[in-house]
Amino acid sequence: MHIIKPVWLTHGGDRKDYEVYSCDVSPDGKRLVTAAGDGYVRIWSTDAIYNAADPEYADKPKQLASLSNHSGTIHAVRFSHNGKYLASGADDKIVCVYVHEPNPPSHTSTFGTNEPPPVENWRTIRRLIGHDNDVQDLGWSWDSSILVSVGLDSKVVVWSGHTFEKLKTIPSHQSHVKGITFDPANKYFATASDDRTIRIFRFTSPTPNSTAHDQIQNFVLEHTVKAPFVNSPLTTYFRRCSWSPDGTHIAAANAVNGPVSAAAIINRGSWDSDINLIGHEAPVEVCAFSPRLYSFSPPGKNATDNQGNAGPTLVTVIACAGGDKSLSVWITINPRPIVITQDLSAKAISDLAWSPDGKNLFATALDGTILVVRFEDQELGYPMPMEENEKSLTKFGTSRRGAGIVESANGLLLEEMSKAGEIKGVEGRMGALMGDGHPSTDQGVNGTPGDLSRSGAATAGTATPTGTQKPQQNGTPNGTPGDQEKPDPYAAKLERLKQRPTYTKDGKKRIAPLLVSGAGGTQSSLPQSRLVASSASGLAGRSEGPETVLDLSKPFDGLPKGGIAAILFGNKRKFAQMEDGEDNSVEKRVAAASQHGANPVLINEPDGLVPAAQTARELQETPEFIRPAVVNPVMAVSQIRLAVPKVRVHIVQGIDTFGNPTSVSSGLASSSQSKADLTLEARNHSGPSLTGRVTDREPSRVSLTRGDQPLWQDFLPKAVLLVTGNKKFWAAATEDGSVYIWTPAGRRLVSALVLEAQPVLLECRESWLLCITAVGMCYVWNVTTLTSPHPPISLAPVLDAAVHTMTQTPTTVPSIIAARISSQGRIILAVSNGDGYSYNPSLYTWQRLSEPWFAVASQYWNTTDSSVGDLQLARNQTGPDAAISAGIIPFLERNTTDEIVVRGRAYFLQRLIKVLLSKEGFESFEAGASIAHLENRVAAALSLGAKEEFRLYLLMYAKRLGAEGLKMKTEELLEGLIGGIFSEGEEKENSVTGDKGKNSEEGLWECESDTICGWPRRDLLKEVVLALGKHRDLQRITVPYAHLLGILDEDKNEADAMVIT
């Protein structure tokens, strides 16, 4: 055995070497990576280390690269087992992933440092954010399908090894997690924590297209080992454990055997510990099994002899180190270590790493030491080939837990079709992510292209940018002639973006960079923004933002900060106490006034009922408004009061050429705002009365102009509070509770609509007009048909009136953050407690579409499944009804997120959920809440008629049902979707021409119509069956539907056609 410690093998500093916390060896054995307190990840040549004393290697490169992508101390570095990636974790809470580029590095050493120029080109490809505290250790699965990071935030975070998406966060430990190791059979991984436990988690390697929603039943806790760590110290920096190469044992650091420090050997399966490696005087912080199995006979003599007896026993080798600065190496058949090296370093040893051949052991220490222990041949035994490792792991099998058995060939065929569709979908998303232009106009079932002939001879998964296709030799273009002849609508925009100069604060000119990879003219298949204003149809009116439509009215007047305030008065009101005067009893004052025939007016005050009194009038400056609106008498007895807007001198609102609301600013219209085409202006009189009486005021003037040219004007007897309008009509609300409506030409469409109180909100969308009064009544009118879809409705249920009306004192209730109306005349409300509501005119009741409970309990909050497809609306593909109620549900959920974060409710709700998850009986709470959230989304989209969102949420719901294996809900969902697909023509005609008609049946599950929420039921059912087809435990339900829809027959016909050709 030789110990090699080169002088140059350090993380050098100005005064001393930095502490080295971690090391690892690449799978090919040519590179050693180390991480230290200087924030650098350094990659060294192992050949240079082994031959440090050889003069011939003096001029050869020693340090291959140095990476500085962390802002603090780096605690862990690990190569992936396929040799493709390198990961590092540090106290900046970040995990960085690097990849080795074959081309030489383009940069030299950094100016002002002593760093040698890099020899290899390592590039950072991902920065993974998921921890709330220091990252202490990392581990790759043996097939490199997942990366697991652990840290001081007590979290175990699982990342995809393909896309590096966060698949799951496991909050299982109760204290700092300081070690992670993987089972070489790829069945388990174990984590060690300061809560004095090692937890074993069972997992199944996720596929490349797996998302967090597919890993619900994956990464589950198998067992918790506590016995070896009952009195273990909590002062160690690491608890780095290791799994034996034959998969039968775990070497656990920081164990105790009575008062003595030890390394515990945990047996696989029973997860007990009956063996302890005792000998260290301080806690063991790191254990490392050699990756090879060893034999005391040469590999050629390990075969069975003539009598059939087995050859020599295979053994494993383990190295342990810790705070006593010593290193011990053990062989499993010997009760004592074969070697113990003391005072190997001046401080505790932090990490150990074996070379792939099992002959070299690297060690790092907190004093900056980096060394290698080289074992001579036969000193540990004869290293066996890796095939012996594979043979020893075969006894653990490779079956998937819960995968089930395929019961028929049709079930296997359906599973293959389901997985093939998912693979095509993920290839398209990865192509869009990497900058390849994939047209998303022809999306078939499960994300597969609707017309495969357009891709020519390209194979599945081949990224073919449509903007770079070359014509063939015969002059015929690869695509269709129409596609080739059309000019690129993005070419002019890209030309304007190129070399666009910008100027900094100090006047220096800069050229804004342009992303070249995204310069294709095709649409990305990645999810786009869910919330933008409604854009006009046609190319001329398209904005530079996403084309997703929010089917809600845009408010002309911005609501005050915090929304429209509301107060609820209880039913049991008492008289207030009067402090001034001889008699302070309100009851006596009211009784005395009543004796003379008077009917005293009582006003609701915070302390109770008091007689009405004239308020003192003082001269005050009112620059922004004239006065408060006159209080309507009905306000004195109403239990709901909303804040009334003040009377302003000048009210101006405008719309652009497409009828969209826009701000009116003189010459200051920015590029993101279109200039107002029509401007409605209301002017209220602010001077003294011309007759000398207060009640005699000049009328308010309402006028419409286009630019500087007046179109029409009208006069109203009362002050105007609110105005709104679009290309179909204009409306104004006055302080006496009247609403006036004009045609675009200025003709009064109807007589004044008289309401019971002052309007506090006036919104319009297409032909619909929404008005909310100060007493909480909501009115909706169709200006075209002069009808209302429902009677006036109260906001009392939305404002929790059922809870607060029985109190004696007025109660502050949630404020109205947003009140909008959709193109279907549906009222949409968002309140300050985070709830989102919609009024259902068919049920005559409010429906809660979004609530804070789902925000903290559901795993699908503020997320969509990108494998299903985005919500980008293509009018030529989905039809004109695609914009109906689009974006309403994401809009309400976004408001819920904002409100609970701003008001601090999220913290307390998260604490409640965390406590519930640890209680008995709530093991499936998170899964149940997530399914309930998806069901609420599907029901909300169906109720609103949101076509695109209904399909998206329906497929997300189907995928979750398949992951959970819920057979009853799956069967019920398929029965609800089948509808009248296979009913007779006469029976179908009778069901459609019934009392309610086809439109009403589109919002029902159990009906005989061919469509649901604007989608053909057959298409949706086919997509759902394909999404569920990969789950074998549900194939008894899905295979009959696949036969009924002809899915399996289509695949067989395609296969037969391929054979014939």
From Swiss-Prot:
Keyword Cytoplasm: no
Main location: nucleus
Gene Ontology molecular function: nucleosome binding
Feature: compositional bias, Low complexity: 456-468
A biological-process GO annotation: DNA-templated transcription
InterPro entries cross-referenced by the UniProt entry: CAF1B_HIR1_beta-prop, HIR1-like, HIRA-like_C, HIRA_B_motif, N2O_reductase_N, WD40/YVTN_repeat-like_dom_sf, WD40_repeat_dom_sf, WD40_rpt
Protein name stated in the entry: Protein HIR1
